[in-house]
Amino acid sequence: MDYFPMIFSLLFVAFHGAPETVVLGAELSTESEQGGEQPSPSPPWRPRRSKRCSCSSLMDKECVYFCHLDIIWVNTPEHVVPYGLGSPLRSRRSLKNSFPTKAADHRNRCRCASQKDKKCWNFCQAGKGLRLQDTMEKDWNNQKKGKDCSKLGDKCIHQQLVEGRKIRRLEAISNSIKTSFHIAKLKAELYREKKVTHNGTH
């Protein structure tokens, strides 16, 4: 396994923060020379990164692109490496955020920062549908095989009809999810192309 891209990104992040520490050290040395008469300056303000939601897995490229709006991505052969995930200061979480709510399911694709964000809520719930896809395909294969209900009676036939409807409904949901993800990918590619052409003109 090639660890060079990961080491390179860590070194970049480490050296990116180094000039700030040098500046802080210089400020401390000048204060000690002056006798510490002046109050210590407040730490430099850092803009907070807008984070729409938090993904259950950083390997989910679409989720990370959706949730972390301003992260620069570097494509490597194995996976996508984010730059500077640990750099911004995090705000403290309240106790109510530390415990999962009834609506939040650990099987979801991500967890929204705001419960009022309907787009985010729908996106995170879509992950649940993708995970159900494998079980749906298994059920569909079992449905194709079918049980021999001639000996079991009306109850078996009714159960097969209900399962068939459920599987068709799940199949329709998964198809709509696939198309929405395909559209999201196309939009992301168009955005990247516009950004590249815009940068190339300047």
From Swiss-Prot:
- Provide the Gene Ontology terms for cellular component: extracellular space
**GO annotation terms (biological process):** endothelin receptor signaling pathway; intracellular calcium ion homeostasis; positive regulation of protein localization to nucleus; regulation of systemic arterial blood pressure by endothelin; regulation of vasoconstriction; vein smooth muscle contraction
Q: Which residues form the propeptide?
A: 26-50, 74-202
Q: Where is the signal peptide?
A: 1-25
Where are the residues marked Cleavage as a site?
A: W73, V74
The ranges of region (Endothelin-like) come to: 110-124
One of the Pfam families matching this protein, by short name: Endothelin
**MF annotations from Gene Ontology:** endothelin A receptor binding; endothelin B receptor binding; hormone activity
Q: Does the keyword Metal-binding apply?
A: no
Locate the region Disordered: 28-49
**Main localization of the protein described in the UniProt heading:** secreted
Q: What does this gene product do?
A: Endothelins are endothelium-derived vasoconstrictor peptides. Probable ligand for G-protein coupled receptors EDNRA and EDNRB which activates PTK2B, BCAR1, BCAR3 and, GTPases RAP1 and RHOA cascade in glomerular mesangial cells. Also binds the DEAR/FBXW7-AS1 receptor. Promotes mesenteric arterial wall remodeling via activation of ROCK signaling and subsequent colocalization of NFATC3 with F-actin filaments. NFATC3 then translocates to the nucleus where it subsequently promotes the transcription of the smooth muscle hypertrophy and differentiation marker ACTA2.
UniProt lists the family membership as follows:
Belongs to the endothelin/sarafotoxin family.
User: What name has this protein been given in UniProt?
Assistant: Endothelin-1
From which organism does this entry originate?
Answer: Atelerix albiventris
Which taxonomic lineage is given here? Answer: Eukaryota, Metazoa, Chordata, Craniata, Vertebrata
Q: Which gene encodes it?
A: EDN1
